[in-house]
A protein has these predicted regions:
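Flexible loop residues that form catalytic
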Residues: 8, 103, 176
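Active-site cleft segment of glycoside hydrolase catalytic domains centered on the general acid/base Glu
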Residues: 19, 25-27, 54-160, 166
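Residue-level signal for short, function-critical loop segments
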Residues: 9, 145-147, 174
Length: 176
Protein backbone atom coordinates (compact mmCIF):
# COMPACT_ATOMS: atom_id res chain seq x y z
CA UNK A 1 0.00 0.00 0.00
CA UNK A 2 1.12 3.52 -0.78
CA UNK A 3 0.24 6.90 0.59
CA UNK A 4 0.52 9.66 -2.02
CA UNK A 5 1.89 12.93 -0.69
CA UNK A 6 1.86 16.03 -2.86
CA UNK A 7 4.71 18.52 -2.71
CA UNK A 8 4.31 22.10 -3.87
CA UNK A 9 7.36 24.24 -4.48
CA UNK A 10 6.54 27.29 -2.34
CA UNK A 11 2.91 27.37 -1.17
CA UNK A 12 3.30 30.66 0.73
CA UNK A 13 2.75 34.31 -0.15
CA UNK A 14 5.32 37.09 0.33
CA UNK A 15 4.29 37.39 4.01
CA UNK A 16 4.79 33.69 4.70
CA UNK A 17 1.06 32.93 4.78
CA UNK A 18 0.08 29.59 3.26
CA UNK A 19 -2.24 29.48 0.29
CA UNK A 20 -4.30 26.82 2.08
CA UNK A 21 -5.16 23.41 0.77
CA UNK A 22 -2.77 21.80 3.23
CA UNK A 23 0.33 23.90 2.48
CA UNK A 24 1.99 20.81 1.11
CA UNK A 25 5.66 21.70 1.22
CA UNK A 26 8.50 19.21 1.65
CA UNK A 27 8.46 19.60 5.46
CA UNK A 28 4.82 18.50 5.53
CA UNK A 29 5.61 15.57 3.23
CA UNK A 30 8.42 14.50 5.57
CA UNK A 31 6.18 14.64 8.65
CA UNK A 32 3.38 12.68 6.99
CA UNK A 33 5.81 10.33 5.26
CA UNK A 34 7.53 9.44 8.52
CA UNK A 35 4.15 8.61 10.03
CA UNK A 36 3.21 6.43 7.05
CA UNK A 37 6.59 4.68 7.17
CA UNK A 38 6.10 4.02 10.88
CA UNK A 39 2.92 2.13 10.00
CA UNK A 40 4.56 0.08 7.26
CA UNK A 41 3.26 2.00 4.26
CA UNK A 42 5.33 2.98 1.25
CA UNK A 43 5.21 6.59 0.13
CA UNK A 44 4.63 8.10 -3.31
CA UNK A 45 5.92 11.68 -3.49
CA UNK A 46 3.82 13.69 -5.96
CA UNK A 47 5.82 16.68 -7.19
CA UNK A 48 3.38 19.20 -8.68
CA UNK A 49 6.15 21.61 -9.78
CA UNK A 50 3.87 24.48 -8.90
CA UNK A 51 3.27 26.59 -5.81
CA UNK A 52 -0.28 25.27 -5.51
CA UNK A 53 -2.59 22.72 -7.14
CA UNK A 54 -1.57 21.54 -10.61
CA UNK A 55 -4.23 19.98 -12.83
CA UNK A 56 -5.07 19.93 -16.55
CA UNK A 57 -6.38 23.51 -16.43
CA UNK A 58 -3.73 24.89 -14.04
CA UNK A 59 -0.05 24.17 -14.62
CA UNK A 60 1.42 27.40 -13.29
CA UNK A 61 5.16 27.83 -13.08
CA UNK A 62 6.48 28.27 -9.52
CA UNK A 63 7.25 31.88 -8.52
CA UNK A 64 10.97 31.18 -8.28
CA UNK A 65 11.08 29.83 -11.85
CA UNK A 66 9.13 32.62 -13.57
CA UNK A 67 10.95 34.03 -16.58
CA UNK A 68 13.21 31.00 -16.98
CA UNK A 69 13.70 29.50 -20.42
CA UNK A 70 13.14 25.76 -20.84
CA UNK A 71 16.79 24.86 -20.21
CA UNK A 72 16.91 26.87 -16.97
CA UNK A 73 13.54 25.50 -15.88
CA UNK A 74 14.65 21.95 -16.65
CA UNK A 75 17.77 22.44 -14.50
CA UNK A 76 15.70 24.01 -11.70
CA UNK A 77 13.25 21.10 -11.80
CA UNK A 78 16.11 18.58 -11.62
CA UNK A 79 17.68 20.37 -8.65
CA UNK A 80 14.35 20.83 -6.85
CA UNK A 81 13.50 17.16 -7.28
CA UNK A 82 16.93 15.88 -6.25
CA UNK A 83 17.27 18.17 -3.23
CA UNK A 84 13.77 17.62 -1.89
CA UNK A 85 13.67 13.89 -2.54
CA UNK A 86 17.06 13.56 -0.83
CA UNK A 87 15.68 15.42 2.20
CA UNK A 88 12.70 13.07 2.35
CA UNK A 89 14.89 9.98 2.05
CA UNK A 90 17.40 11.28 4.61
CA UNK A 91 14.48 11.72 7.03
CA UNK A 92 13.84 7.97 6.88
CA UNK A 93 10.72 8.05 4.72
CA UNK A 94 10.19 4.81 2.78
CA UNK A 95 9.73 6.30 -0.69
CA UNK A 96 8.81 3.63 -3.22
CA UNK A 97 7.57 5.88 -6.01
CA UNK A 98 7.87 9.46 -7.20
CA UNK A 99 5.30 11.10 -9.43
CA UNK A 100 6.97 13.59 -11.79
CA UNK A 101 4.22 16.15 -12.36
CA UNK A 102 0.52 16.03 -11.58
CA UNK A 103 -2.27 15.60 -14.13
CA UNK A 104 -0.02 16.67 -16.99
CA UNK A 105 -2.50 16.08 -19.84
CA UNK A 106 -2.15 19.61 -21.21
CA UNK A 107 1.24 20.65 -19.94
CA UNK A 108 3.50 20.90 -16.95
CA UNK A 109 5.09 23.68 -14.95
CA UNK A 110 3.80 26.41 -17.26
CA UNK A 111 4.88 24.57 -20.43
CA UNK A 112 2.35 23.35 -22.99
CA UNK A 113 4.68 22.37 -25.85
CA UNK A 114 5.01 18.56 -25.80
CA UNK A 115 8.77 18.61 -26.39
CA UNK A 116 9.25 20.99 -23.44
CA UNK A 117 7.04 18.84 -21.22
CA UNK A 118 9.11 15.79 -22.16
CA UNK A 119 12.31 17.69 -21.35
CA UNK A 120 10.92 18.46 -17.88
CA UNK A 121 9.83 14.85 -17.39
CA UNK A 122 13.30 13.65 -18.36
CA UNK A 123 14.91 16.01 -15.84
CA UNK A 124 12.57 14.94 -13.07
CA UNK A 125 13.08 11.27 -13.85
CA UNK A 126 16.86 11.66 -13.88
CA UNK A 127 16.73 13.38 -10.50
CA UNK A 128 14.68 10.52 -9.06
CA UNK A 129 17.11 7.94 -10.47
CA UNK A 130 20.09 9.89 -9.10
CA UNK A 131 18.53 10.18 -5.63
CA UNK A 132 17.62 6.49 -5.68
CA UNK A 133 21.16 5.49 -6.62
CA UNK A 134 22.66 7.72 -3.92
CA UNK A 135 20.34 6.25 -1.28
CA UNK A 136 20.61 2.65 -2.48
CA UNK A 137 16.83 2.44 -2.96
CA UNK A 138 14.75 1.20 -5.85
CA UNK A 139 12.28 4.03 -6.52
CA UNK A 140 9.68 3.90 -9.29
CA UNK A 141 9.09 6.91 -11.53
CA UNK A 142 5.44 7.65 -12.36
CA UNK A 143 3.85 10.01 -14.86
CA UNK A 144 0.30 11.09 -14.12
CA UNK A 145 -2.68 11.94 -16.30
CA UNK A 146 -6.35 12.43 -15.52
CA UNK A 147 -9.79 11.97 -17.06
CA UNK A 148 -8.62 10.41 -20.31
CA UNK A 149 -11.71 8.68 -21.63
CA UNK A 150 -10.25 8.37 -25.11
CA UNK A 151 -7.76 5.49 -25.27
CA UNK A 152 -6.38 6.91 -28.52
CA UNK A 153 -5.34 10.09 -26.72
CA UNK A 154 -3.71 8.08 -23.93
CA UNK A 155 -1.91 5.96 -26.51
CA UNK A 156 -0.65 9.13 -28.23
CA UNK A 157 0.65 10.55 -24.94
CA UNK A 158 2.41 7.33 -23.94
CA UNK A 159 3.82 6.74 -27.41
CA UNK A 160 5.31 10.23 -27.27
CA UNK A 161 7.09 9.33 -24.03
CA UNK A 162 8.38 6.06 -25.45
CA UNK A 163 9.54 7.51 -28.77
CA UNK A 164 11.51 10.19 -26.93
CA UNK A 165 12.83 7.55 -24.49
CA UNK A 166 11.49 9.19 -21.34
CA UNK A 167 12.54 7.03 -18.39
CA UNK A 168 9.50 6.05 -16.34
CA UNK A 169 8.14 2.89 -14.74
CA UNK A 170 4.42 3.39 -14.33
CA UNK A 171 1.51 5.59 -15.33
CA UNK A 172 -0.98 6.99 -12.85
CA UNK A 173 -4.49 7.76 -14.07
CA UNK A 174 -7.04 9.69 -12.03
CA UNK A 175 -10.71 9.82 -12.91
CA UNK A 176 -13.19 12.20 -11.29
Amino acid sequence: NYIRLRVWNDPYDENGNGYGGGNNDVATAITLGQRATQYGMKVCIDFHYSDFWADPKKQFVPKAWEGMNIEEKSDALYNFTLENLTQVLDAGVDVGMVQVGNEINNGMCGETDASNVRKLLASGSKAVRDAATASGKDILVAVHYTNIDDMKKLDTLLTGLQVKEIDYDTVGLSFY
